[in-house]
């Protein structure tokens, strides 16, 4: 029996949709900084065991369609405090990092370094998947059975050989650039030598991608979104770190991670996590990107600390206003 794919998110109410657009514009308005270098090559996947009691497979869980409750809007003072805390965490790690989070319950956003450029590593595979779907539709067809199998291997198991072939299929750099424009990216550039793992992107553009996958915005159809999300929600357990740190019991988590050591940075690690967390009490889009960690483990730890720091502050921050209860 075919696996049931998750349901799609319905349109936001008009007022909330307007608020979300305005909030996203504020998130994307962070002043840019110089982009990082690019990867010489993509590294093979590494495994990290998920602790006992960790994320369970989400294959049969529908995406939450009822609005999540709770959350709070950060006051300017609390926003500044959170920004300073995030900056200290990054500085203490010795790495460089950027994070963007959008709370779909309230429209609240937080970003730090959201316009900074980072090499994607395997996060590029999520963009390649969306672009492949658009490419097939332009040809008047759906993905073939072989393509669906390849995409599954690329997203769930981070297969690099498959990514090489699918990057060729979307048209290498010209095809990628066209797809980036259709998805609304403003700070994403393919590697000049066509190395997909060296694609330069920003946390802000990854939020744009997540909105294209999670909401009815963007060029993807409901069935196309559901297919890609179904793969993101069933990644191999050893790759289910990062964004999932924000999840509670029973929450739906969809993500794609990227990780690789960089010879050009003395073997220090680039570690990225992009995805969403949805449940009765939370509904987040999250993109966190980093480079310069001393090893894989510390890079994952930094990613998860940033995720939990920001989402915890958005849950019910001291001095914040619960959703629907503006300050006086």
Feature-to-residue mapping (PLM):
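Penicillin-recognizing serine hydrolase domain
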Residues: 2-19, 25-27, 32-68, 73-97, ...
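Acidic/histidine-rich, surface-exposed loop or edge segments in extracytoplasmic proteins
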Residues: 57-72, 108-113, 129-132, 156-160
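A mature extracytoplasmic/lumenal domain signature
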Residues: 103-105, 114-116, 122-124, 158, ...
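Glycine/charged-rich beta-loop-alpha catalytic/anionic-binding loops adjacent to active sites
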Residues: 106-115, 187-190
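Active-site SXXK
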Residues: 107, 117-141, 154, 286
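Extracytoplasmic/secreted cell-surface and envelope-processing proteins
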Residues: 110, 163, 295-299
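Conserved catalytic neighborhood of penicillin-recognizing serine enzymes
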Residues: 136-186, 202
């Amino acid at each position: 029996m075919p696996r049931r794919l998750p349901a799609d998110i319905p349109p936001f109410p008009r007022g909330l949709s307007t608020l979300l657009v305005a909030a996203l514009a504020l998130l994307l308005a962070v002043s840019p900084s110089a982009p990082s270098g690019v990867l010489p090559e993509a590294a093979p996947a590494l495994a990290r065991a998920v602790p006992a009691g960790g994320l369970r497979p989400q294959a049969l869980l529908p995406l939450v369609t009822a609005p999540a409750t709770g959350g709070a809007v950060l006051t300017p003072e609390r926003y500044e405090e959170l920004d300073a805390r995030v900056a200290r965490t990054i500085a203490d790690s010795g790495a460089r990092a950027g994070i963007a989070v959008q709370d779909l319950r309230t429209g609240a956003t937080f970003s730090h370094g959201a316009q900074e450029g980072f090499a994607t590593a395997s996060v590029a595979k999520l963009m390649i998947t969306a672009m492949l779907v658009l490419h097939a539709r332009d040809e008047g067809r759906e993905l073939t059975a072989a393509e669906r199998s390849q995409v599954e291997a690329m997203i769930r198991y981070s297969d690099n050989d498959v990514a090489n072939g699918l990057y060729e299929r979307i048209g290498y750099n010209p095809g990628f650039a066209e797809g980036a424009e259709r998805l609304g990216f403003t700070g994403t550039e393919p590697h000049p030598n066509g190395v997909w793992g060296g694609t330069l992107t920003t946390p802000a553009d990854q939020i744009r991608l997540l909105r294209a996958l999670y909401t009815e915005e963007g060029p993807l159809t409901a069935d196309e979104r559901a297919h890609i999300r179904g793969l993101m929600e069933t990644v191999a357990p050893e790759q289910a770190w990062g964004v999932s740190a924000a999840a509670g019991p029973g929450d739906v988590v969809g993500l794609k991670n990227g990780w690789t050591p960089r010879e050009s940075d003395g073997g220090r690690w680039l570690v990225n996590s992009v995805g969403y967390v949805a449940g009765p009490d939370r509904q987040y889009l999250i993109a966190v990107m980093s480079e310069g960690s001393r090893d894989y483990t510390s890079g994952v730890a930094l990613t998860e600390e940033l995720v939990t720091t920001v989402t915890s502050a958005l849950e019910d921050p001291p001095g914040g206003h619960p959703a629907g209860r503006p300050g006086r």
